[in-house]
A protein has these predicted regions:
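N-terminal beta1-alpha1 cap of cysteine-dependent amidohydrolase-like domains
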Residues: 1-166
Length: 166
């Protein structure tokens, strides 16, 4: 919008000898108005393996922010290293969060912490959003807690396990 106020599109079109219609920035202006009008806050925990490098989850962050623009909420992200979540720490770490998101990842590091986060979300009635690995984690947690398969896992993490639910 600042570039358009400086007539950049007119300059570019003129220099390139293009016949350009006037810019319609209605959608942009409406989005900015929605962003400015947000009145509530939502706290989302992202429980992952790469939380020290936020750019690893850039698309997840941007998706949450844009969802907030559309719903009138300022989204605050709490970065949670999966390996720090266990039955003793889950409440302290996740209590203030309005929702828990477990994104994708590879390898078995942090898997048990993610399972504890999914368990906390389910038992405390917190919204849980599992993306890729995060959805697999939800299935593993449910199989362990609700179906009684204490050793439920993914064949990716336990290739010879008796209860490979993924």
């Amino acid at each position: 919008l600042m570039l358009e106020r400086s007539h950049l599109s007119d300059i570019v079109c003129r220099e390139l000898h293009l016949d350009c219609p006037p810019c319609d920035l209605t959608d942009w202006n409406e989005m900015l108005a929605r962003i400015a009008a947000r009145r509530r806050s939502v706290n989302i925990a992202i429980v992952g393996k790469y939380t020290k490098l936020h750019d690893a989850y850039l698309s997840v962050m941007e998706s949450l922010y844009h969802a907030g623009y559309e719903t009138g909420a300022v989204v605050h992200i709490k970065w949670v290293e999966a390996e720090e979540v266990n039955p003793y720490t889950a409440d302290d770490i996740l209590r203030e969060c309005d929702g828990i998101l477990v994104p994708g990842g590879f390898g078995d590091r942090g898997i048990e912490g993610m399972v504890h986060a999914a368990h906390y979300a389910r038992t405390q009635g917190k919204p849980y959003f599992g993306i890729c690995l995060g959805m697999q984690i939800a299935v593993i947690e449910y199989a362990r807690s609700m179906l009684g398969y204490a050793d439920a896992n993914s064949s990716e993490f336990d290739p010879v396990g008796a209860h490979s639910v993924i």
